[in-house]
């Protein structure tokens, strides 16, 4: 069944649909690093039927359970911003891409537990248990979305150029492997201030 049919009329389902479309756009713009986006998109598609099913029951639930869904909807909207920002990064900004991919991987991991959830429509106790787990998930997602990724410092008469180098094979592993191995990143920072050139170099493992 098409995703658009599954989520018709559902606010949370619409948020999932928007995230799915953002992932597709990001994949089109970042073909060499689409593996992590494929995994996130696969998880989104697999949990959408469950979300649509439970959201129908949610209309009859109490305020606290409705808040769980509302919080998740807002977090998914933030996830759209995360995915779109990742797609906007320039290809040479490898450090930025690595950090965004790590955040996207954490996002996918936080959602993935719902793939195997089987909730029967007539078992309200199961629904409440699911809502409790979703509330915990929302807390984790809030931490993921709230972590700063970029820090930009601007001063008058100062120009800064950042050059990053990383082994492409290691970068691919960071995005497509299930391991937690990190690429070695060699960073050169060069800037000029008051007609003087400055530079610093460091390596991130």
From Swiss-Prot:
InterPro entries from the UniProt entry: Powdery_mildew-R_dom
Key words, A-Z: Coiled coil, Hypersensitive response, Membrane, Plant defense, Transmembrane, Transmembrane helix
Upregulation: Expressed in leaves after powdery mildew infection (e.g. Erysiphe cichoracearum UCSC1).
Top-rank taxon: Eukaryota
Regions crossing the membrane: 7-23
Principal subcellular localisation of the protein: membrane
Any one annotated GO CC term: membrane
Domain RPW8 stretches: 1-153
Membrane topology label: Single-pass membrane protein
Location of the protein in the cell: Membrane
Alphabetized Pfam families for the sequence: RPW8 (PF05659)
Any one biological process term the GO annotation gives: plant-type hypersensitive response
Coiled-coil stretches: 70-92, 125-147
Family classification: Belongs to the plant RPW8 protein family.
Function: Probable disease resistance (R) protein.
Protein's name according to its UniProt entry: RPW8-like protein 2
